[in-house]
Amino acid sequence: MPWIGLDDTDTLSGGCTTYEFHLLITELSRLSDLGSPWGLPQDTRLVRLWPFASKRTRGNAALALKIDVLEGHENSLLDFLEGWYASLKKRISELEVVQSNHSERLQHSPEPCLLYLNKQFPDFYWKAVRGHVTLEDAKKTVLEDPLSKIWSDEKKMSGLIGSLAAISWKGDGDCTWELTAYRRIENYLTKRRISNESVKMMSNKYNKTLLNRDPNSKKPLISPNTPCPVLYGIRAENDIDALNAHDYLQSFDENEICNSHQIWRTNQATGDHIEKRYRGVLNSNPIILKGGHIYLEISGISDGVNEEILMAFEESGNIKQLANDLKKGDTIEWMGLRCPTGEIHLERLKLVKATIGNRKRPMCVCGVRFESSGKNQPLRCKCGKTFPRLWVGEKRDSSEWKEPSSGNRRHLSKPLNRI
C-alpha cells in the first residue's frame, strides 16, 4: 500500500507542516468520497526526529499517511499530488525567514519535500531519530523503491529526510497520539483563548492524556506561542481519549472554537531518540557553569567508554538539583542525548551508590582521631590503639530517577509515568 510523506514547510514567522498535511488529508478524503480511485487516508502520523539536526524545522516533526489506490490508477493519485505540491510551493514562498531570539540555531528557508513510496525503511527511521543522516543517505534509500516519486527543489530538498523517516516509522513497540486543533483564519492574529482552568479539568477528567500542564508553574502546555494555525495539541495514550478531551475543551464557552482537527499517531514521549541507559562514577565534584548549568565528569562507564561529560541544564529542574548534590566517587545512572560537540545532555538521572559525606577517620576512645598507618594497614592512634580501616561520615541515600518538568522536556522524551 502506498505511503505519502511531507516535511519542512514552516518558518518561525509562520507556516505549519501539520496544517498543510491536514489540508492534504482533507482533500484526499473529499475526493475519495466523490469517487476518486483511492481510499480514505490511513495511519496519519506525526514523527519527531533527532533534536540536533542542523536544518530541523520549528518542531522538527514530519508527517505521513498510508493510502490504498485502485490497481492501475496510481497515476491519478500522482497527478493530484503534483498539483497539490505546486500550490503548496506557492503558499510557502511567501513566508518570511526570521531569526530566533531564544536560540542560536540559524534559521533557513523551507525546503519542502512531498514523497510517495510503496515501502517503508525502518532502519532509516532509527538513524534519523538518533543521529545525523545526510541528504545523500535519504536519496540512496528512496532509490531502493523503483516506484518512488519525489516532489522538491533539486537543490533544496532537506525535507526528504523527514518525509522518508515519517513514512519509515513503524511505531509497533510504542506510540502515543495527538489531536491537533486548528484555528479559524479570522483568529490567526489574535491571542489564543484557552482557559487554564479548563485544561486543568480536562487533565483530571481524562487521565490518559499526557503533558497537558506544567506541574510547577501550573501553566497549560497544549498551545504554541508561535504565529501558526495550531490552536492546541492534546497528547494521549490512545486516540479515543484525545478526541474526548478535545470535545470537552471545546464545550467551554470561554475557549476559542477551532476550525478543524486532526488525529495523529506519534513517536512523542516514546524515548526513541535514546538507545539505552548508562552507569558510571564521578571523577570530581560537579562544576557549576555560567547560567547555573552543571558539568559532570564521568569515568568507569558500563559500556567500556573511558570518560564522558554530562550536562544538566538549569531548566532541567530535578535533574539539575540532583546533579548539584553529587560528590566525587558517586555512582550514577543516566539517559541522555549526545550533542554534536560531544557532551551528553541529560534527560534522566539517578544516584545509584553514594559516597560518604564529610568523610573522616573514626575517633579513638582517647579523644584523638585515628590516622592511616600505611597501605592495607589498620588505622592507628597516637595512644597506640589500632582500628580497622574505614571512614565515618554522613550517609547519603540513593535516589529514584529524576526527570525535567513537563514544560522543559523534549517532545521525544519518555516520562517516568510511561515506563
Model segments located where?
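Short, charge-patterned binding micro-sites
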Residues: 44-65
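N-terminal ordered "arm"
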Residues: 2-48
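Short nucleic-acid-contacting surface segments enriched for D/E, G, S/T with interspersed K/R
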Residues: 317-333
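Cys/His-rich short segments
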Residues: 350-418
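OB-fold (S1/OB) nucleic-acid-binding surfaces
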Residues: 285-316
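Structural detector for short beta-strands of small beta-barrel domains
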Residues: 272-291, 358-362
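Flexible glycine-rich surface loops and low-complexity tracts that mediate binding to linear polymers
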Residues: 278-285, 328-342
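Long, hydrophobic alpha/beta structural blocks
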Residues: 74-271
